[in-house]
Each structure stands twice: as C-alpha cells, then as structure tokens.
C-alpha cells in the first residue's frame, strides 16, 4: 500500500468522523449545553430576584417595626395620660368628698353647739327661776341674798 492511499483513506475516515460527529453527536451536545446555560441563567436571575425580594422584605420589616414601635409609644403615652386623668379625677373627687364631709361635720358641730346653748339657756333659766323662787320665799336680807347667789353660782 501506498502512502498516498493510506493518507487518502485516513483523510476519508477523518472526514467521515467529522461528518458523523457534526450531524449525530454535536447537535445533542450543543442542545444539552444550551439547556444547561439556560438553567444556570434562570437560576442566577431567580437568585437576583430573591435577593431583591429579600431586601424589600427586610425594608418592609424595618418600616413595620418602626410603625409598631411608634404605635406602642403612642399607646403608652395615652395610657399615661389616661392614668393622669384618672388620678386627677380621683383627687378632685376626694377633695369634693372631704369638703362635703367637712361641711356636714361643721353643720353637725353648729347644730350640737346650738343644742348645747339651748340646753344651757333652759338650765340657766330654770336656775334663775329656782333662784328667784328661793329669794321670794325668804325674806330678803343681805346675808340670805348673798348665800343664794353663791348657791346659784355653784350650780352653774
């Protein structure tokens, strides 16, 4: 065999190999590679989208927490204000009740004093009448008069 025939046969075999690879093997390989590239690209896009959504969610969480904190502070302030109002109302009610009780006590004291004065007047008038009776029953002389007045003073 001739060297040219061998080179020609090898060239023909190589061309047949190239044709078989190019028509039968290469297209499915390219298709698999392209599908893999597409999946990788989709995965990267999904990862980017996930990162963006995560950042948005974190921002939204921060806003929500800030609003919740603000609302909590407002509620606490309202509770303090309401407690202050309740305390002030209780103080005012206690002062009013104290004043009312003082007025009632003052009225009772005045009534008791009035009763005591009336009782004292009655007692003094009875003593005066009794003293006058004693004076009128006896003859009036200086010693008797003085003695009766001393008795009345002792009774008073």
From Swiss-Prot:
It comes from the Bacteria. It is found in: Cell inner membrane. GO terms for molecular function: proton-transporting ATP synthase activity, rotational mechanism; proton-transporting ATPase activity, rotational mechanism. The chain crosses the membrane at residues 3-23. InterPro entries: ATP_synth_B-like_membr_sf, ATP_synth_b/b'su_bac/chlpt, ATP_synth_F0_bsu_bac, ATP_synthase_B_chain. GO terms for cellular component: plasma membrane; proton-transporting ATP synthase complex. The keyword Transmembrane helix applies. Keywords: ATP synthesis, Cell inner membrane, Cell membrane, CF(0), Hydrogen ion transport, Ion transport, Membrane, Transmembrane, Transmembrane helix, Transport. Pfam families: ATP-synt_B. Its main location: membrane. It is a single-pass membrane protein. F-type ATPases have 2 components, F(1) - the catalytic core - and F(0) - the membrane proton channel. F(1) has five subunits: alpha(3), beta(3), gamma(1), delta(1), epsilon(1). F(0) has three main subunits: a(1), b(2) and c(10-14). The alpha and beta chains form an alternating ring which encloses part of the gamma chain. F(1) is attached to F(0) by a central stalk formed by the gamma and epsilon chains, while a peripheral stalk is formed by the delta and b chains. NCBIfam families: ATP_synt_b (TIGR01144), PRK05759.1-2 (NF004411). F(1)F(0) ATP synthase produces ATP from ADP in the presence of a proton or sodium gradient. F-type ATPases consist of two structural domains, F(1) containing the extramembraneous catalytic core and F(0) containing the membrane proton channel, linked together by a central stalk and a peripheral stalk. During catalysis, ATP synthesis in the catalytic domain of F(1) is coupled via a rotary mechanism of the central stalk subunits to proton translocation. Belongs to the ATPase B chain family. PANTHER family: ATP SYNTHASE SUBUNIT B, ATP SYNTHASE SUBUNIT B', CHLOROPLASTIC. This is ATP synthase subunit b. It comes from Xylella fastidiosa (strain Temecula1 / ATCC 700964). The gene is atpF.
């Amino acid at each position: 065999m001739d060297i040219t025939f061998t080179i020609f046969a090898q060239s023909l075999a190589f061309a047949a190999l190239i044709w078989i690879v190019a028509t039968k093997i290469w297209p499915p390989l390219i298709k698999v590679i392209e599908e893999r590239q597409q999946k990788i690209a989709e995965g990267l896009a999904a990862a980017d989208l996930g990162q963006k959504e995560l950042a948005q969610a974190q921002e939204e969480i921060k806003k929500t927490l800030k609003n919740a904190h603000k609302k909590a502070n407002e509620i606490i302030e309202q509770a303090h204000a309401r407690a202050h109002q309740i305390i002030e109302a209780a103080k005012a009610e206690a002062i009013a009740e104290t004043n009312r009780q003082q007025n009632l006590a003052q009225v009772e004291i005045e009534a008791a004093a009035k009763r005591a004065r009336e009782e004292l007047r009655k007692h003094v008038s009875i003593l005066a009448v009794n003293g006058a009776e004693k004076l009128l029953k006896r003859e009036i002389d200086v010693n008797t008069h003085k003695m009766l007045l001393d008795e009345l003073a002792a009774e008073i």
